[in-house]
A protein has these predicted regions:
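Mature catalytic domains of secreted/periplasmic carbohydrate-active enzymes
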Residues: 1-162
Length: 162
């Protein structure tokens, strides 16, 4: 029998106790769409003009939460930051003339209110079969590297299956 022990980082995460997980992205603009939905979603409809991550996080903090996690990319493949790896992201939307960055606004707001910040990235993607394996690996590693080096996260959250 294997003796598995949690890492120091996993144990520290347990001490965080109470937090929020935000699932916000392109699909919020498509009523009735679900995970693994086969219908296309045009990035040009993404325009959260009233996005106020600071308001979300002030509410979380007031409720006693100590951390918040943002979904950076989910199964639809849309990146909530202006990734250099692919075009299906906030950089090709009307929101802030393609200069917006949901992940930056979220991570900055977490720090402003004194909350730990985590990022969720789904490695699974509904159009993944359109990539050859090496191309997808490069795309995946490139995006993960952007998130881990560009946003100073407290705990990166990544699952192999969702």
């Amino acid at each position: 029998m294997t003796n598995c022990k949690p890492s120091k980082q996993q144990l520290a995460f347990l001490d965080w106790e109470f937090g929020a997980f935000f699932h916000f992205g392109l699909r919020a603009f498509y009523k009735g769409y679900r995970d693994w939905d086969t219908r296309d979603m045009d990035a040009s409809v993404f325009n959260p003009e009233k996005l106020d991550c600071a308001s979300w996080l002030r509410t979380c903090k007031a409720a006693g939460m100590t951390y918040a996690i943002m979904t950076c990319k989910h199964l639809d493949g849309f990146a909530n930051w202006p990734t250099a790896y692919g075009d299906y992201s906030v950089k090709n939307t009307p929101w802030k003339n393609g200069k917006g960055d949901v992940v930056r606004e979220f991570t900055d707001a977490c720090r402003e209110v004194g909350m730990k910040v985590g990022l969720y990235y789904s490695p699974a993607q509904r159009d993944q079969s359109a990539f050859d394996k090496m191309d997808y690996d490069d795309y995946f590693i490139g995006q993960i590297t952007e998130l881990l080096t560009g946003y100073d996260v407290s705990f990166p959250e990544c699952h192999a299956s969702t």
